[in-house]
Amino acid sequence: MLERKKPKTAENQKASEENEITQPGGSSAKPGLPCLNFEAVLSPDPALIHSTHSLTNSHAHTGSSDCDISCKGMTERIHSINLHNFSNSVLETLNEQRNRGHFCDVTVRIHGSMLRAHRCVLAAGSPFFQDKLLLGYSDIEIPSVVSVQSVQKLIDFMYSGVLRVSQSEALQILTAASILQIKTVIDECTRIVSQNVGDVFPGIQDSGQDTPRGTPESGTSGQSSDTESGYLQSHPQHSVDRIYSALYACSMQNGSGERSFYSGAVVSHHETALGLPRDHHMEDPSWITRIHERSQQMERYLSTTPETTHCRKQPRPVRIQTLVGNIHIKQEMEDDYDYYGQQRVQILERNESEECTEDTDQAEGTESEPKGESFDSGVSSSIGTEPDSVEQQFGPGAARDSQAEPTQPEQAAEAPAEGGPQTNQLETGASSPERSNEVEMDSTVITVSNSSDKSVLQQPSVNTSIGQPLPSTQLYLRQTETLTSNLRMPLTLTSNTQVIGTAGNTYLPALFTTQPAGSGPKPFLFSLPQPLAGQQTQFVTVSQPGLSTFTAQLPAPQPLASSAGHSTASGQGEKKPYECTLCNKTFTAKQNYVKHMFVHTGEKPHQCSICWRSFSLKDYLIKHMVTHTGVRAYQCSICNKRFTQKSSLNVHMRLHRGEKSYECYICKKKFSHKTLLERHVALHSASNGTPPAGTPPGARAGPPGVVACTEGTTYVCSVCPAKFDQIEQFNDHMRMHVSDG
């Protein structure tokens, strides 16, 4: 290809100088507008040269860009436009729209505050928001372990790319970034925090304090708030304790793959970033050694625990071997938000021993949860599949009684602990600077006695501090608490399975109590709809006349004594202790029974935020969201046709296999789809007056040959819950299903 330069005429040079405005950086553009970079290629026409130079940059007049390039046989002109700051302009426009409240389609809630933003920006800037938005959430609640200001700064960072972090708030930003999974902010905040450690590290050696506060060895809480800032600034060694406490807590909630990430950062900066002299013959400080030991102990515990994922059956209690003794831990199901072991706990008296529970780490996403593990009505529960031995009626004062009186397993565990060895207890200090009223974050400490296998469960409250160190054989675990001791379902309320409601509100669905067999009819207990704001559920008793829709009362599941005993004796068959008295259907798990009761009550607590359609189960809502997203994940391997549901693909495959398993009982004609058969039968029904297959039993047609009266006749679709009064509308609806595959 041959290239030649065309000399610029004086007229062209004068025109380009008149239209050129030089910026400080040397480029030419109008002030306040994005910088445009035009490159003219193949321009033999002088008229086009004038238009090009009127918009080109000043650097286009020098070097190889100072001329027009033309080639033989080419007459088309191509312009290359490069807007250097176009992305920043778009983000600034989006941020301005967010501040004005325009086009905001996502609500972020934290500590009762509400932040509005655009879902595209949140999904692009945070994997946490992306996972939530892919599930169809438009109202997202952030765990209340961080401040509103930290989340606000991170959202502003997504819109601007600029984040200003001071030394005092680096930990709060690091915690919030860990929850939102913003890796760039995590790396930068970790570096800032580590530099802060280097500034005050000599003070640690001088003060003689070996164990930082917040570690398992010190037994102190890693909680902090803005009220401590003055105290921490005057005491540098406490600042280091606070730093390590937050880093250790962050490493506990970041998954098995990054558990030692933050502690490793502290250790590595001890040698590199801090600029400390390193002698190969000198041992590490004791607190560095303890970091290694604690990190290795936690990794060994996580790797040796046999059950770290969900299981459909109730897991058996397991024994966890520690450095000194054994801890008897009953594994329960997981909470989806595993941040710092946030639970409501209370202080127990000395020498009390009770069975504690532990939630497993979240190894998979919400889509991989087995159906037997989660209560899909918006409440995550830790419910076993075995029937309860003793069921108590829920009363108005049950919530208070459950806190004052221990349950039977707790009483049984107290007896051997009375004669056991003494253990260190928790002491609260009224003037402690560690007291915090802003952030609610508790931890459950299980202290292992050196001379006994029994474990003592210490439960510090929110506003407590440790007066003396606890033994080094401790394991930080979380406790799954029940809202009440008598209400068996649900046991744990989490914010991840929210009910998507109107106006951005999240509600708790109705709950059902369980009653023992032979206890007689009891009224139902429903929970009043209320936002998930950390407050306990309020219950109201619904009397039997209130259920006017049904002739019989909706009772609690009745254990099948005869069938259960027969199955136990023979060792064969599956035990289904929960029976619905309305339709006599039996269930193995209690949560499945509760889901089934939605069919009778007609309650649909899950609502689509786009079309406002309600569903009884969360699974139905997730499947429905596919209709809005348009994702067709199931493809036919023969004709490459795609479908939104797997069931639609299975029905479609009958066409390729030539299966016609549906036969008309009138004309014996066969069909491959059930919908085609029902549509065909409906045509027979319209001609001879016979009610269609979806007609209720009470609506019967008249004599043969007479068209039945359509009043009271309902045509029910067998694919979806749609109902029609006219046969024409029913036929049109069935054609829609057939065309969909």
Swiss-Prot record:
It holds the Pfam family BTB. Keywords: Disease variant, DNA-binding, Intellectual disability, Isopeptide bond, Metal-binding, Nucleus, Phosphoprotein, Repeat, Transcription, Transcription regulation, Ubl conjugation, Zinc, Zinc-finger. The keyword Phosphoprotein applies. Sumoylated with SUMO1. Residues 1-17 have a biased composition (Basic and acidic residues). Residues 1-32, 203-235, 350-440 are annotated as: Disordered. Changing G602A: In PRIMS; strongly reduced DNA binding; strongly reduced ability to repress transcription; dominant-negative effect of the mutant on the wild-type allele. GO terms for biological process: cellular response to glucose stimulus; lipid homeostasis; negative regulation of gene expression; negative regulation of transcription by RNA polymerase II; positive regulation of glycolytic process; positive regulation of interferon-beta production; positive regulation of interleukin-6 production; positive regulation of lipid biosynthetic process. PANTHER family: AGAP004733-PA (PTHR46105), ZINC FINGER AND BTB DOMAIN CONTAINING 45 (PTHR46105:SF22). May be a transcription factor that may be involved in hematopoiesis, oncogenesis, and immune responses. Plays a role in postnatal myogenesis, may be involved in the regulation of satellite cells self-renewal. This is Zinc finger and BTB domain-containing protein 20. It comes from Homo sapiens.
